[in-house]
Amino acid sequence: MTQTAPTTAPQPAPAPESFLAVVLRRSRYTIAIILSAILFCTLGWQLAGPPPEWAGVSLVAWHNHGMLSALLLTCMLLAATGICALLVHPDSPHMGLACALLGMAGLSIRGGSIYMLVRFAQEPGQSFAAVAQGLAIECLEWAVILLIAETAGKLLHDRFFANTHWIMRSGPELGASLLNGTKENAPVMGVALAVSKSLGTRNFPRWIAAPLAMLGSGALAFLMLLILMQTQHKGQVLMACFAAFFISTLLVYLAFPRVPIPAYLLTVPLTAAAAYLYGMHADARYPGHLSFFALRALPIDYFTAGIPGAIFGYYAGFRWALHSADEHPAA
């Protein structure tokens, strides 16, 4: 008696979303971000708020913050990620984390800019180089928090919120082909296939492709920050961080589509740490104003705006590839 492998019925391509469905879906994103912002601006402020006479949210700059504050803030981020994943379901595995971090940007906005740290560095006996080194170390702390949040968020999504709707919505025809098993390596199709083939990166092993993708994404983000981050105003700083890592991740994804998303996300805090160390000897051109662009943002700015930008850039590249496939790799 022989057994045959069970087969599943092919999934037809879904009909395009109606205008009302798009509005409702994006309204859920807005609600998730607002709830996350309320959580971090109230409870999170009690954990990470700067001293009354200063400003700027930092895990290491102020002596009243320690590992306990970082641990509690991580737990709060995990809770916000779970709530946001529930609100935006069904969606991609990292949309809950993206909404939670965008809400966490409210904590950064409430905390103020890096101006107070610049003033502190200009006091007698102080050195901005030491402050920049501390901020670079803080970026590594945020990188650890990111790894914990990304891993927990992915496990939570796979356990409770796993779905294929986001793949079908990203590319109806190729998404259906991917889920039905008729095409392999669908994320490597279209523009991503053309770019990776032309650059010769298509068949790179992952242990080579991942570091190259991180270096390329970091270099592009550094260039975009140089162009976009022209002031220390918090809104402009957050927008510059989001746009820089969105563009860099999208472009590098097309060259390295097989590199997993954690590598692109880790590029954000590592790029910020490298930027702090690179500009640690920059002098203030005017009192309270830094001439080096990357030092106009705090680590929390890179974390709460840069990582959502990288997430949206990654999935924009995924969507672009699925929508523009005229050529596919051999099975």
Predicted regions and their residues:
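Membrane-helix interface and helix-disruption motif detector
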Residues: 25, 44-70, 88-94, 121-140, ...
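Membrane-helix interface "capping/anchor" motifs
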Residues: 78-100, 251-266
